[in-house]
């Protein structure tokens, strides 16, 4: 009887470990190719474009923004492609200064571009507080 109980317990623990490892990471900061990457999917859930959330990944090396990449969203592709132009303005800037930059929205894609700017600001603020 004891052996059967121990086998059940071991199976249960293995199942729990497997499920825990399959869960998505919730930490917004990770490392990729030598860069610190901030993902705003969970950081800025309340930031909305015209059709919904507009999360980004911000790549930072040596304290400077290397790249900002828009993630999957529900924005209208035609307008969102124009809105993404604001992201290039952050590249090459020091993270602490980029977080405070004044970036204008894109005409015709105002909601989307403003949401992208707010996502970048939230991500850089988080980076500064947790690096």
Model-based region annotation:
Residues 2-114, 118-131:
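Flexible, solvent-exposed loop/hinge segments and secondary-structure transition points
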């Amino acid at each position: 009887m004891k052996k059967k109980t121990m086998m059940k317990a071991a199976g249960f623990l293995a199942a729990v470990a497997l499920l825990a490892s399959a869960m998505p990471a919730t930490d917004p900061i990770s490392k990729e190719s030598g860069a610190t990457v901030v993902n705003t999917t969970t950081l800025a859930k309340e930031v909305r474009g015209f059709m919904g959330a507009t999360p980004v990944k911000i790549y930072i090396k040596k304290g400077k923004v290397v790249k900002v990449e828009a993630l999957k969203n529900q924005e209208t592709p035609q307008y969102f492609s124009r809105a993404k132009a604001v992201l290039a303005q952050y590249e090459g800037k020091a993270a602490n200064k980029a977080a405070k930059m004044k970036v204008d929205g894109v005409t015709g894609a105002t909601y989307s571009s403003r949401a992208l700017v707010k996502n970048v600001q939230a991500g850089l603020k988080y980076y500064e507080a947790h690096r």
